[in-house]
Regions:
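Periplasmic solute-binding protein
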Residues: 112-114, 135-173, 181, 200-225, ...
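Conserved C-terminal helix/tail region of periplasmic/extracytoplasmic solute-binding proteins
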Residues: 166, 349-350, 362, 378-432
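Glycine-centered hinge/linker elements that transmit conformational signals in sensory
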Residues: 227-257
């Protein structure tokens, strides 16, 4: 399950980070370190990786291979949810791991105070081996690389039931968002629930709104928002919120939208109870727990959508990337870089095979067992634009405010104004 920090929790964590003892760690803004040979001996060196409940198995096999190759000892600690807040609280008190899974977006790198807390990964030896479209897609703050992308980042788009489409004569994805809504109306008229929303768990309510911003994002919407030249009350955002509400009021969503859960949404799409959902990669992970690759390939498809065409929105999460902390111990810091170099170098082919995940490297093929929908998600990355989480300097509670709108507790205008107020508070706390 995907979780997001609330604005209140993130604001508290930002204040903690800002108030942490500057003498507890190394000086800020150190340059990149040397990159050791990936299999250089590390007998007696102990490293710690912090991971969330949904990422703690990701490094298991590659870490084991690294230990055998180098003699190092690597411990994987599972940090309780809310993961990001728990880490920020511990980091603020000087409790640092060697590496951690971390959302590699500008806002979350800012939240962890990357320039003073994280090692620079500039000059990493595997970067040139990555698919050119992915090299600089995330993990960079103010021109410095702080995060190593290890798995394909999530994309906001539409997952659909292929069998429902076929039964109703839909032979190709709609050409744009307006045609998507028209398709929803057609399906509703034929007795199908067009879209399914999980308003009870709330966090996915933002996806139908964000995809409507893709064209504006191409024109610099998030950058303008960061500079105060646009806001969450700007017409493009307010219109997207109103359109979402209009689709709900028109009956294009499930009747239990206010209480439906993440699990309900997965069940509805797999069974054909609903035709489509706006979602990200973690949703497909749920489906993989319900069906094997053959059934998924027969049943579930994916397409990106935007006002003018098929443009997705990138939203990398913590399971996609790792950061290396500046612990003040030069040996461990170098060993952490060495582990990343091993992981993304000679250990990468075995890693993607073990995880049955899409390869990020041009010279490493994706495993045969990766479902087609995930390959389609990955293929959409080169033409995708950044989400709010990826490019805004702060991430307010848009999803909570939208869920409140679904429950009749907010108007679109109140959603926009409340979200803007939260954004300004968070940006100020982050020093932006």
């Amino acid at each position: 399950m995907k979780r997001f920090l609330t604005a209140t929790a993130l604001l508290s964590a930002l204040v903690l980070t800002a108030c942490s003892d500057p003498g507890a760690g190394p000086a800020a803004n150190a340059g990149p370190g040397e990159w050791p040979d990936p299999t250089a001996k590390l007998d007696g060196v102990e490293l710690t990786i912090w991971a969330a409940q949904n990422s703690n198995t990701v490094p298991k096999e590659v870490v084991s291979a690294f230990e055998k190759a180098t003699g190092a000892s690597v411990k994987i600690d599972t940090i309780p949810d809310p993961y990001e807040q728990s880490i920020q609280t511990r980091v603020a008190t000087g409790d640092l791991p060697d590496l951690a899974f971390w959302q590699p977006t500008a806002s979350m790198l800012t939240a962890i105070n990357a320039p003073s807390k994280l090692q620079s990964l500039e000059g990493a030896p595997w970067i040139d081996e990555l698919d050119p479209a992915l090299r600089d897609i995330t993990g960079i703050l103010d021109g410095t690389r702080y995060a190593a992308l290890v798995t394909s980042p999530a994309v906001i788009g539409v997952y659909y039931n292929k069998k429902v489409f076929a039964e109703h004569g839909v032979t190709a994805p709609p050409a744009n968002f307006a045609e998507l809504v028209d398709l929803g109306r057609k399906l509703k008229g034929e007795g199908v629930t067009p879209f399914y929303e999980m308003g009870g768990d709330r966090w996915a309510t933002q996806w139908a709104v964000q995809v409507q911003l893709a064209d504006a994002v191409k024109d610099g919407f998030w950058e303008k928002l960061n500079e105060g030249k646009e806001s969450f009350e700007s017409p493009v955002m307010l219109d997207a919120i109103r359109t979402y509400q209009g689709m709900v009021k028109e009956g294009l969503y499930n009747d239990d939208i206010v209480t439906a859960t993440f699990e309900d949404q997965g069940d509805a799409l797999m069974s054909g109870k609903a035709a489509m959902v706006f979602q990200v990669n973690s949703f497909f992970g749920q489906l993989q727990a319900k069906a094997d690759t053959a059934e998924l390939n027969d049943t579930i498809g994916f397409f990106p959508i935007s006002p003018s065409g098929h443009v997705g929105m990138v939203i990398p999460d913590q399971s996609n990337a790792l950061v290396a902390f500046r612990t003040g111990d030069a040996t461990r810091e170098a060993a952490a870089r060495q582990l990343l170099s091993f992981w993304m170098g000679q250990g990468y082919a075995d890693f993607v095979a073990d995880r049955q995940t899409v390869s990020l490297k041009s010279g490493v093929d994706s495993p045969a067992g990766v479902p087609q929908a995930l390959l389609d998600v990955h293929a959409s990355l080169p033409d995708s634009v950044g989400s709010m989480q990826a490019l805004a300097v702060a991430n307010p509670d848009l999803y909570i405010n939208l869920a409140d709108m679904l429950a009749g507790e907010m108007t679109p205008e109140e959603v926009a104004s409340t979200t803007q107020d939260q954004f300004e508070q968070l940006a100020k706390a982050a020093g932006k």
